[in-house]
A protein has these predicted regions:
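Sec-dependent bacterial lipoprotein signal peptides
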Residues: 1-25
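Extracytoplasmic/lumenal domain signature
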Residues: 23-37, 43-75, 79-115, 119-380
Length: 380
């Protein structure tokens, strides 16, 4: 017990929170953001089902509202609040942007590129960086970008996941982390096989984490112990969608799977025709997925035999975005299409610079797209 205690102290010291150091490099911004946002963005794409935009509609012919460059290139998916959005930038920064004007309110330097995108919770922004050997997880103040705390970790490229007062992160070295959000203390570290590129998923039964070693794990929330594991037909590179007791995911070998929790048994397995790099989404009782060859899949969650597919004649690595008025998809060549879910016909399209690597998002009728040059474009 004494040896274990000393080892725990050494580990805790090495992965210690470094709030003083990060505060010393902070430069106050000339513009301030809001003190808080009422709507949270706690997981990749906003909700566990990836259906944050399902009640939204677009105008019949959306027009460019603004275009913003906030650095060399935006990486990852944005976190969208009611008045602002937050993005990670390739030149080691996080930026807060006014949704009405596209004006950058502040930029904060961080230790590496934010590949997985930020999370937004009330008066805080959470980000993790890709860097070796000094990657960090941060909590930033929404109003001015000032670091509240930072914690050293291995390099992180996967999106984070927030669950109450707990933050989960998966590293490039295949380690899952649980952190406390009040001060950034690491509660546990669980080494897994393979790198973690997909967002971890907090579920009622534990934390689901997929690795590039073609394995899906279910970890105990309290300890990080492995409760179940499943060999997947290919790697899972985007966060699974969670709906009740099921996970829905796509793999690099072109399979779409429904996985039952907590045993991680396969409820159904459907051939998508090509690799699936983007995250599936669940809207009401239907699963939406987009294969690399541009095939849009519309799958009744409980009747997969009734699945329909539409060849959209695009190449895609981003997942689809279900709306009330259709399904948004984006291509590696820069096209954004609004697709009719009944016929597969394109009701609207716009050409941007490609590749578009993250799903387009809509809030309050405003379409937000991260263009291929790393700029942010808003349409209404």
């Amino acid at each position: 017990m004494k040896v274990g205690h000393r080892r725990g102290i050494l580990v805790a010291g090495f992965w210690a929170v470094n709030a003083t150091a990060c505060a010393s490099s902070y430069v106050p911004p000339s513009k301030l953001g809001p003190a808080r946002q009422e709507t949270s963005w706690p997981v990749y794409l906003g909700t566990p089902r990836h259906d944050a935009c399902v009640a939204e509609s677009l105008n019949a012919d959306p027009r460019l509202l603004w275009r913003a460059d906030v650095g060399r290139a935006v990486r990852g998916s944005p976190a969208i609040g009611e008045t602002v959005l937050v993005v990670g930038v390739a030149d080691r920064a996080v930026a807060l942007v006014d949704r009405a004007t596209g004006q950058a309110l502040w930029r904060t330097r961080v230790a590496g590129t934010v590949q997985g995108g930020p999370l937004l919770e009330s008066d805080r922004v959470y980000v993790a960086t890709e860097a070796a050997p000094d990657a960090k997880l941060y909590a930033l103040r929404l109003r001015d970008g000032q670091p509240i705390w930072s914690t050293r970790t291995e390099s992180v490229v996967a999106p984070l996941a927030l669950d109450g007062d707990t933050l989960y992160a998966g590293t490039e070295t295949g380690v899952m982390l649980r952190l406390e959000t009040d001060a950034g203390k690491i509660a546990w570290r669980r080494p897994l096989g393979g790198a973690i590129r997909a967002a971890p998923v907090p579920t009622p039964d534990g934390i689901a984490a997929a690795t590039t070693a073609d394995t899906l794990y279910l970890l105990d929330r309290a300890t990080g112990a492995v409760r179940a594991r499943l060999a997947t037909p290919g790697a899972v590179l985007a966060g699974p969608a969670l709906d009740g007791s099921r996970l829905y995911l796509g793999t690099t070998s072109g399979r779409l799977l429904a996985i039952e929790l907590p045993a991680l048994t396969v409820a159904w397995d459907l051939a998508a025709g090509d690799a699936v790099f983007g995250a599936p989404a669940v809207a009401r009782d239907t699963v939406y997925a987009l294969a690399r060859n541009g095939t849009l899949w519309v799958i009744p969650a409980r009747q997969p035999a009734a699945a329909r597919s539409f060849a959209l004649a695009i190449a895609a690595t981003a997942g689809p975005t279900p709306l009330a008025s259709g399904v948004l998809v984006a291509s590696v060549s820069g096209e954004v299409l609004l697709v009719d879910r009944g016929s597969g016909a394109a009701a609207w399209r716009v050409q941007l610079d490609g590749p578009i690597e993250q799903p387009p998002l809509v809030r309050d009728g405003q379409l937000v797209v991260i263009g291929g040059r790393g700029d942010i474009q808003a349409y209404r």
